[in-house]
């Protein structure tokens, strides 16, 4: 993780030099580092999981032991390797390596082989190692296992990829999927909480508790809680295989160490020696253990093993002591290897719990970023992989038992190889997880949710694409909560989470985005040398008494390990020394280490101590260390106790220790693209962050190589004349999202009310905001096969009049051909019968065939059976299409106004857009007014203005700066001009504000949403029109529409809409008994004609003269029949 220099290359301001760059069109030597950093958290976490983490996970999987024919069989995974994606040897191909573009084009999965070495033993005697294929696992694009790793842009283009391909996603069935980063509690840190619902866990339980999420090196996690009970004792609870267990704390402490009761008592009361209540509580906890007859560590282990072994699923030959040790290893403080370290940590948690219950310290806010970290994609991948490997071992026993029931099976190398091949593969579980985002797990992996873990990395535009890699979600469980506390923006989030980049709907505050400078720690570092370094700085080891009383010392925790105690007067010096080592890269201190010293305040505040963190998945960000003059990565917890200045004049000597790298470091990547965002109302910046991701832009450059279901393309994009410096930092001109437009703020017609806007028809005819939609369809003839047949190929039957001059000889349309409704789309032949089949184009929208790809099978031996046809649908802006500026000012195109009727300036210039001035007062988007002046001056002087937020202030006014530039060009200081009416030619009385604004065309188009129906398909049961645009269904008519018609008194129109045009039917009814079901058509005598002289009779009354016809909705007849099935009779009165 490189700290120095990454943000030093930030452009001082935007420029137009790229327009005259002589190397345009030539791929650069290296990829843009800023873009690659956006997905670094995803890629690096997967690299660790697939390489180092996999070996740690294999070591953490305990041997699977079971009895078979009076023998003890042991299976152990000793090694596992994931191979880069490739096709099997013997495949017909030029290169065995598989590349992502091939998987996208064939709707297949980008995956590699997982091979493991399985060691087996009988009765404890090793018998050998078998190399076994466990299945395919998905590979993250641009990771070290990907075949694109470290390739330069030129080679990436040769493999049909983007020159700036960032990776960070998986390809599942041809679709790019991203594992979401989720907010989880900070690992290996005791969090004091107050939860009233804990009182319902048992008699005497209180709302006080201390929780810790213990995480191992291979990311396996177990949540562990200490509960305070009313009688002063403590209960320890943990979860094993989704089941909650409770254990008195005294049993856990005595099981971990062979200390005497007095030693345990002395350790627990450290710092509280004078607290008689606490001393009595500790004595009571130890007395509970003695009352169960457990006086020694071995007796306690035997007792715990006897109680828990039924839930641990261990072999019968395991003694109780080993079962208890298995429990301690898998459920209690699992991040620690030493039982002594676990003992000291539980003692610290107990002291913190009593301090919370006695009101001596505050509770920690679990919704604060201080007590949180992120769940990285590699972490989920590794946890899921480890569990599935454990399940594979269990499946081998099941297969072995089934085989033994049918035949006499002996355990040898050959038989085990056959049985191993019958175990459950890991291929389908992984593809299901990434394809659906649903987690199928017996343990739950310690998550609060089992759905929504993955999302599609759709390339609607480049902003939306890259935001997938910077978003963090609070969790699906919190979306259903009625409370708003989890959604609040807390001050602790400053610099880590963007305050404006969050949706304005249901996910508001739950779906957040990291700031541009925020990073996620992805590396593990071994900290074996740090405890000795701390002791050298004055920290007293945990098993040694300090010089001062414990109440005058801080506990020192390093990644959840109780290292020792430090004098409270010496602690600031120790923290500063560690910080200096971190910044200067000395003493092997990692640069992402977090040094948080929580001081004693004499008041109930956060629990004091010196907490050191080097673990991954934490959020860190760079700031300038004023004392050392270098950049430093700081974490969320240590930022609470720092004085970080923003501007130079806020730095006070002896108080300010750090300074922000730049004022806009609190904004996300997308929010940094908003020009003059500091001049806008905050909600407008939120809206732009969302609308910027809905813009019809230029998401990629390899349209000809993509097979996405739908892609958008703006045909006439432009580089904005007014843009922040971050726009150039990320080279966003390669993926533009809008057009510079001449905008006049004038209420010129009646068609611009309620945010509607007028567009110059001449500009529209010249291609203003013209776009296209690319749609791809896969046709696989193998899906059309009948049972046992393989005889269909694409082609045209010679002389077929249906496809003359429409399809090529291969049965496919010509490239560039225009398709209309009913035109031949493609044709295929049955080689056995010679019969030809023609499929016709069924879409109502005309299109152009853009490209056709021919696909094969995995072995390269497939016939001409699978193709992908991509069509291009031109989309000119039409009335009703949505547009927006970069300041959250959205509106629809209401009218294309003829150029001869548009107002014009003295120079004859006509605006492209007429914007209603009533859109400014309530929205307060002053940034749009400034952009209009800046864009106008930029066009006049041939410049590109810097719109980075916070560069202007009250002393350095933006109005003064851009007004003077307009004045220098001969225009009005305030950006207004005299306009002339296009209708009368008369000069307008008011000065009109006119300038250049960058406008975006959004993807919400009338062509995708309009719906018209006269007659069409109906539902078979209710006889009502079907819903849905794709099936030409009826238009939805809801309660609000009904109420509107009732309010206007148009009841007959309501009758026509909801009855005549819906499911009107004529039914026979008995007037006497009021039944719709009793009238039945009588059966005629054999001599009668079947169609003549037949009449309805009431089966209840036995009469036919009481039968009449009524018009009722068909769904009512269905409803009456359903009620009759429940013995409920419906009687109608006829008036």
Swiss-Prot record:
GO MF: DNA binding; DNA-directed RNA polymerase activity; DNA/RNA hybrid binding; ribonucleoside binding; zinc ion binding
Protein name (database record): DNA-directed RNA polymerase I subunit RPA2
Residues at which DNA template strand binds: 1036
Gene Ontology BP, a term: neural crest formation
Pfam families in the record: RNA_pol_Rpa2_4, RNA_pol_Rpb2_1, RNA_pol_Rpb2_2, RNA_pol_Rpb2_3, RNA_pol_Rpb2_6, RNA_pol_Rpb2_7
Lineage start: Eukaryota, Metazoa, Chordata, Craniata, Vertebrata
Classification via CDD domains: RNA_pol_B_RPB2 (cd00653)
Cofactor: Mg(2+)
Residue(s) carrying Phosphoserine: 1051
């Amino acid at each position: 993780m490189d700290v120095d220099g990454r943000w030093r290359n930030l452009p001082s301001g935007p420029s137009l030099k790229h327009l005259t760059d002589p190397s345009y069109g030539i791929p650069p030597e290296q990829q843009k580092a800023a873009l690659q950093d956006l997905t670094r958290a995803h890629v690096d976490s997967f690299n660790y999981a697939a390489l180092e983490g996999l070996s740690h996970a294999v070591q953490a999987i305990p041997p699977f032991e079971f009895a078979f024919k009076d023998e003890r069989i042991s299976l152990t995974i000793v090694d596992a390797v994931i191979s880069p994606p490739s096709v099997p040897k013997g495949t017909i191909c030029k290169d065995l390596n598989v590349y992502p573009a091939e998987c996208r084009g064939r709707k297949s999965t980008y995956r590699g082989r997982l091979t493991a070495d399985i060691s087996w033993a009988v009765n404890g005697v090793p018998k050998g190692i078998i190399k076994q294929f466990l299945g395919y696992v998905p590979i993250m694009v641009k990771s070290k296992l990907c075949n694109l790793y470290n390739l330069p842009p030129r080679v990436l283009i040769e493999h049909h990829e983007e020159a700036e391909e960032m990776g960070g996603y998986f390809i599942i069935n041809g679709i790019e999927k991203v594992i979401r980063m989720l907010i989880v509690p900070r690992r290996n840190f005791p969090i004091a909480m107050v939860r009233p619902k804990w009182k319902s866990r048992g008699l005497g339980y209180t709302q006080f508790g201390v929780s810790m999420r213990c995480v191992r090196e291979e990311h396996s996690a177990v949540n562990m809680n200490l509960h305070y009970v009313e009688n002063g004792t403590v209960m320890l609870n943990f979860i094993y295989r989704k089941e909650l267990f409770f254990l008195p704390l005294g049993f856990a402490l005595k099981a971990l160490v062979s200390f005497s009761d007095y030693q345990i008592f002395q350790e627990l009361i450290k710092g509280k020696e004078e607290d008689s209540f606490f001393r009595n509580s500790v004595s009571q906890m130890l007395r509970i253990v003695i009352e169960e007859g457990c006086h020694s560590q071995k007796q306690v282990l035997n007792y715990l093993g006897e109680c828990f072994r039924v839930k641990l699923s261990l072999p019968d030959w395991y003694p109780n002591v080993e079962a208890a040790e298995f429990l301690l290893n898998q459920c209690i403080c699992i991040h620690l290897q030493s039982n002594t370290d676990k003992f000291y940590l539980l003692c610290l948690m107990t002291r913190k719990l009593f301090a919370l219950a006695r009101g001596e310290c505050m509770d920690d806010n679990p919704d604060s970023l201080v007590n949180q970290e992120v769940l990285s994609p590699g972490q989920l991948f590794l946890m899921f992989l480890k569990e599935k490997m454990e399940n594979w071992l269990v499946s081998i026993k099941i297969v072995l038992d089934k085989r033994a029931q049918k035949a006499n099976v002996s355990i040898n190398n050959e038989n085990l190889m056959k049985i191993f091949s019958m175990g459950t593969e890991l291929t389908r579980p992984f593809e299901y997880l990434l394809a659906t985002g649903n987690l199928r797990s017996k343990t739950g992996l310690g998550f609060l949710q089992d759905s929504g873990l993955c999302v599609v990395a759709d390339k609607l535009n480049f902003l939306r694409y890259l935001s997938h890699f910077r978003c963090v979600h609070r969790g699906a469980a919190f979306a259903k909560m009625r409370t708003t506390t989890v959604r609040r923006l807390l001050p602790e989030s400053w610099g880590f989470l963007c305050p404006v980049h969050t949706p304005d709907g249901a996910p508001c505050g739950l779906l957040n985005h990291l700031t541009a400078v925020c990073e996620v720690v992805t590396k593990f570092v071994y900290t074996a040398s740090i405890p000795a370094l701390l002791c050298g700085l004055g920290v007293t080891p945990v098993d040694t008494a300090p010089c001062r009383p414990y109440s005058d010392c801080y506990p020192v925790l390093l990644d959840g390990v109780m290292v020792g105690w430090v004098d409270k007067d010496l602690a600031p010096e120790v923290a500063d020394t560690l910080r200096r080592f971190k910044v200067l890269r000395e003493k092997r201190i990692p640069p992402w280490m977090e040094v948080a010293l929580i001081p004693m305040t004499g008041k109930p505040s956060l629990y004091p101590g010196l907490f050191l963190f080097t673990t991954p998945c934490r959020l860190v960000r760079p700031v300038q260390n004023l004392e050392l003059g270098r950049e430093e990565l700081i974490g969320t917890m240590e930022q609470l106790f720092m004085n970080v200045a923003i501007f130079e004049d806020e730095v006070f000597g002896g108080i300010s220790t750090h300074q922000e790298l730049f004022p806009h470091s609190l904004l996300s990547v997308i929010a940094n693209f908003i020009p003059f965002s500091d001049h806008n109302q905050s909600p407008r910046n939120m809206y732009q962050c969302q609308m910027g991701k809905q813009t019809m832009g230029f998401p990629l450059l390899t349209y000809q190589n993509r097979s996405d279901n739908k892609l958008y393309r703006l045909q006439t994009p432009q580089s904005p004349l007014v843009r922040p410096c971050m726009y150039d930092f990320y080279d966003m001109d390669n993926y533009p999202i809008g057009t510079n437009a001449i905008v006049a703020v004038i209420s010129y017609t009646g068609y611009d009310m309620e945010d509607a806007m007028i567009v110059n028809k001449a500009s529209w005819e010249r291609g203003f905001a013209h776009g296209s939609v690319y749609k791809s369809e896969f046709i696989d003839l193998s899906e059309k096969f009948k049972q046992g047949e393989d005889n269909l190929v694409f082609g045209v039957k010679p002389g077929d009049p249906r496809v003359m001059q429409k399809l090529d000889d291969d049965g496919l349309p010509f490239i560039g051909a225009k398709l209309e409704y009913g035109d031949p789309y493609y044709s295929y032949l049955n080689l056995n019968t010679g019969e030809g089949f023609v499929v016709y184009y069924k879409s109502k929208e005309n299109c152009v065939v853009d490209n056709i790809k021919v696909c094969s099978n995995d072995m390269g031996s497939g016939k001409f059976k699978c193709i992908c046809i991509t069509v291009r649908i031109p989309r000119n802006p039409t009335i009703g299409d949505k547009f927006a500026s970069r300041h959250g000012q959205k509106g629809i195109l209401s009218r294309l106004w003829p150029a001869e009727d548009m107002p014009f300036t003295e120079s004859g210039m006509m605006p492209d857009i007429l914007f209603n001035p009533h859109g400014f007062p309530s929205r307060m988007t002053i940034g749009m007014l400034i952009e209009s002046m800046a864009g106008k001056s930029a066009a006049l002087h041939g410049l590109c203005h810097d719109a980075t937020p916070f560069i202007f202030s009250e002393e350095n006014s933006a109005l003064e700066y851009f007004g003077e530039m307009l004045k220098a060009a001969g225009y009005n200081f305030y950006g207004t001009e005299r306009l002339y009416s296009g209708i009368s030619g008369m000069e307008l009385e008011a000065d009109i504000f006119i300038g250049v604004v960058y406008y975006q065309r959004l993807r919400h188009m009338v062509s995708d949403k309009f719906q018209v129906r006269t007659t069409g398909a109906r539902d078979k049961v209710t006889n009502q029109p079907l819903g849905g645009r794709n099936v030409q269904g009826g238009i939805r008519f809801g309660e609000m529409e009904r109420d509107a018609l009732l309010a206007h008194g148009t009841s007959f129109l309501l009758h026509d809409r909801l009855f005549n045009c819906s499911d009107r039917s004529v039914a026979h009814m008995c007037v006497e008994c009021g039944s719709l079901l009793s009238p039945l058509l009588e059966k005629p005598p054999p001599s009668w004609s079947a169609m003549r002289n037949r009449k309805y009779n009431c089966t209840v009354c036995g009469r036919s003269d009481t039968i009449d016809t009524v018009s009722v909705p068909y769904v009512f007849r269905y409803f009456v029949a359903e009620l009759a099935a429940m013995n409920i009779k419906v009687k109608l009165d006829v008036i």
